[in-house]
């Protein structure tokens, strides 16, 4: 049975972990980093993922960042004349994580637990699951990020009862969840959040400030210059991180622009106080969901035993101060905010595989679910913060006489009117026998599985006719599209493998040419001239093949040269052996003479 890996698929960074010998371990990427930037780039037909993609983002407009913000929408990325969905881009990141997890474990990996923000709706969860499938992973479970963090924190504290608040501020999303821990049960009491608030927004306020200051000084708007903007983004992110440890930082961007007098440089000092002033409204925005979650759970700040901080953005001192002030407790610093979610996902993988015993995870649905009823009203069937998996039925009837079909419009959200909520899907129940309005009885049942994915069915109780759907949002992919994308992803992986093989082959060939030249120099005058000429010709043939694109030709010429060099080496060794033998026999004669002299000396004595 292959191992189940845990993946934190983040907006800015992703992380992968696995359970080994009962202990969760974060798997480092090929560069040695424990997290991998969620960045994909395309360059000359080649695909770059992670650190290498992030490094060249400034100069390459075909670089995609923060794709997670578009999951569950019909957003498309146009690159080199081809269209990509957010699911495909996310799948490329997942494929990369999968590949280095396989290299680390030394076996194929096909199963994963992937985390999502607790506040992700059904379309976003479905898109994440599809991304996993495209990457060649069987997604065993979609788990909420704060819940995963609580699992990682609480696994070794199962004997104590406590109420914990997980404050998760990532690169692009914000979640807060309140959980009760006790006797191995992790029960989510309430969850709230904002899917469009995160570290990217903190970077943005610094960028806006730098653009504004530069405009005041030089009259040039840097936000119109794509390359300057990418440099500003990198500088803003760096400044934000530095201000978590120091009180002020220097931002220096030489040659950021130019006017008629020559090049212009951006030199600025940013203090922590100024950054806090610029981002105060963002910090305050995170407090709304905190209060909402407490209210939904029926708790006061005094009832919270521990505050767990998750996500790189929680390193910002103003964020820590705000949550401390709100809850009245110092946040717990015992977990790594960048890795804890992936570790929790790996533990959940262990629970599914049966390697972790006595752990029960009870999560909740973040948003209410229901259908549109007469007058455009949103009628809730399942309230938010209901423990999942769950099922709920309600009986509805027709709105007009002799109505033979009903449209079921499935929605998710908290607003009273249907139009203000998120449409998850629509389907129709037909062939209802004509009857006066109010007579037919139509039972609508909602099921939410452990992944938070919704299944709905409607049944006419008179005829027992039933119609059901697993929600596929307007942005959802059809089975054909998923299969096509899986095939493309496999082909890309194959192309990547071939490209890697080609690079390795070219390197080996280069190295062989170098060693052959060295060997031929050493062999001058020691072996037959015809043999040297043969090796020289084979070497030149390989050099010529390297200039071409025919991989099989390079391989054949490399093997031919290797054979010639081997034969040369054998001949060299044979000659060396003959010489050594000749010297040995000469030496033996000399030895006899020496012995004789030595004996004579003895006799004289």
Swiss-Prot record:
<dbReference type="InterPro" id="IPR029048">
    <property type="entry name" value="HSP70_C_sf"/>
</dbReference>
<keyword id="KW-0597">Phosphoprotein</keyword>
<comment type="function">
    <text>Acts as a chaperone.</text>
</comment>
<keyword id="KW-0143">Chaperone</keyword>
<comment type="similarity">
    <text>Belongs to the heat shock protein 70 family.</text>
</comment>
<dbReference type="GO" id="GO:0140662">
    <property type="term" value="F:ATP-dependent protein folding chaperone"/>
</dbReference>
<dbReference type="InterPro" id="IPR018181">
    <property type="entry name" value="Heat_shock_70_CS"/>
</dbReference>
<dbReference type="InterPro" id="IPR029047">
    <property type="entry name" value="HSP70_peptide-bd_sf"/>
</dbReference>
<feature type="compositionally biased region" description="Acidic residues">
    <location>
        <begin position="593"/>
        <end position="605"/>
    </location>
</feature>
<dbReference type="InterPro" id="IPR043129">
    <property type="entry name" value="ATPase_NBD"/>
</dbReference>
<dbReference type="Pfam" id="PF00012">
    <property type="entry name" value="HSP70"/>
</dbReference>
<dbReference type="InterPro" id="IPR013126">
    <property type="entry name" value="Hsp_70_fam"/>
</dbReference>
<protein>
    <recommendedName>
        <fullName>Chaperone protein DnaK</fullName>
    </recommendedName>
</protein>
<keyword id="KW-0547">Nucleotide-binding</keyword>
<dbReference type="GO" id="GO:0051082">
    <property type="term" value="F:unfolded protein binding"/>
</dbReference>
<dbReference type="InterPro" id="IPR012725">
    <property type="entry name" value="Chaperone_DnaK"/>
</dbReference>
<feature type="compositionally biased region" description="Low complexity">
    <location>
        <begin position="575"/>
        <end position="584"/>
    </location>
</feature>
<keyword id="KW-0067">ATP-binding</keyword>
<feature type="region of interest" description="Disordered">
    <location>
        <begin position="575"/>
        <end position="605"/>
    </location>
</feature>
<dbReference type="GO" id="GO:0005524">
    <property type="term" value="F:ATP binding"/>
</dbReference>
<feature type="modified residue" description="Phosphothreonine; by autocatalysis">
    <location>
        <position position="173"/>
    </location>
</feature>
<keyword id="KW-0346">Stress response</keyword>
């Amino acid at each position: 049975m292959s191992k189940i890996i845990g993946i934190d698929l983040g907006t800015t960074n992703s992380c992968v972990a696995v359970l080994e010998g009962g202990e969760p371990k974060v798997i480092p990427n090929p560069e040695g980093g424990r997290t991998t930037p969620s960045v994909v780039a395309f360059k000359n037909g080649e695909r770059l993922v992670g650190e290498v993609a992030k490094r060249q983002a400034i100069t390459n407009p075909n670089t995609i960042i923060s794709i997670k913000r578009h999951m569950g929408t019909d957003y498309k990325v146009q690159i080199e004349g081809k269209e990509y969905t957010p699911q495909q881009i996310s799948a490329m990141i997942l494929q990369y994580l999968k590949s280095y997890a396989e290299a680390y474990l030394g076996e194929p990996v096909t199963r994963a637990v992937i985390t999502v923000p607790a506040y992700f709706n059904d379309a976003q969860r479905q898109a994440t699951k599809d991304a996993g499938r495209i990457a060649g992973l069987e997604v065993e479970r979609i788990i909420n990020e704060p819940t995963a963090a609580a699992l990682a924190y609480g696994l070794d504290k199962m004997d104590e009862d406590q109420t914990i608040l997980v404050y998760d501020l990532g690169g692009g999303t914000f979640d807060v969840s309140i959980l009760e821990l006790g006797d191995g049960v992790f029960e989510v009491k309430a969850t709230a959040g904002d899917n469009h608030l995160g570290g990217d927004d903190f970077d943005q306020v610094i960028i806006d400030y730098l653009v504004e200051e530069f405009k005041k000084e030089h009259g040039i708007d840097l936000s119109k210059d794509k390359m300057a903007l990418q440099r500003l983004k990198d500088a803003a992110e760096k400044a934000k991180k530095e201000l978590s440890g120091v009180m002020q930082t220097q931002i220096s961007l030489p040659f950021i622009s130019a006017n008629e007098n020559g090049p212009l440089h951006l030199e600025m000092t940013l203090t922590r106080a100024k950054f806090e002033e610029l981002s105060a409204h963002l910090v305050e925005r995170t407090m709304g969901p905190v209060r909402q979650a407490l209210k939904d759970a029926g708790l006061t700040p005094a009832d919270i035993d521990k505050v767990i901080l998750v996500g790189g953005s929680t390193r910002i001192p103003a964020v820590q101060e705000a949550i401390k002030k709100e809850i009245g407790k110092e946040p717990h610093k015992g977990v790594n905010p960048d890795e804890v979610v992936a570790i929790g996902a790996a533990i959940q993988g262990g629970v599914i595989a049966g390697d972790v015993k006595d752990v029960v995870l009870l999560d909740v649905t973040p948003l209410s679910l229901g259908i549109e009823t007469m007058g455009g009203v949103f009628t809730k069937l399942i309230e938010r913060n209901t423990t999942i998996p769950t099922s709920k039925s309600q009986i509805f009837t027709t709105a007009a006489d002799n109505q033979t079909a009903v449209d079921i419009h499935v929605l998710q959200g908290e607003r009273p009117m249907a139009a203000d909520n998120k449409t998850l899907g629509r389907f129709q129940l037909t062939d209802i026998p004509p009857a006066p309005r109010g007579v037919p009885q139509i039972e609508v049942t909602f099921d939410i599985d452990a992944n938070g994915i919704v299944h709905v069915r409607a049944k006419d109780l008179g005829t027992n006719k039933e119609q059901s759907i697993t929600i596929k949002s307007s942005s959802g992919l059809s089975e054909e599209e998923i299969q096509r994308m899986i095939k493309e992803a496999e082909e890309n992986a194959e192309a990547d493998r071939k490209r890697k093989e080609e690079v390795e082959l070219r390197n080996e060939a280069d190295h062989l040419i170098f060693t052959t030249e060295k060997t031929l120099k050493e062999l001058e005058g020691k072996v037959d001239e015809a043999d040297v000429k043969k090796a020289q010709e084979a070497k030149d043939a390989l050099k010529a093949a390297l200039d071409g694109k025919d991989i099989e030709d390079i391989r054949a010429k490399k093997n031919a040269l290797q054979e010639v060099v081997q034969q040369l080496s054998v001949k060299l060794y044979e000659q060396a052996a003959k010489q050594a033998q000749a010297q040995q026999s000469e030496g033996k004669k000399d030895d006899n003479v020496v012995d004789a002299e030595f004996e004579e000396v003895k006799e004289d004595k």
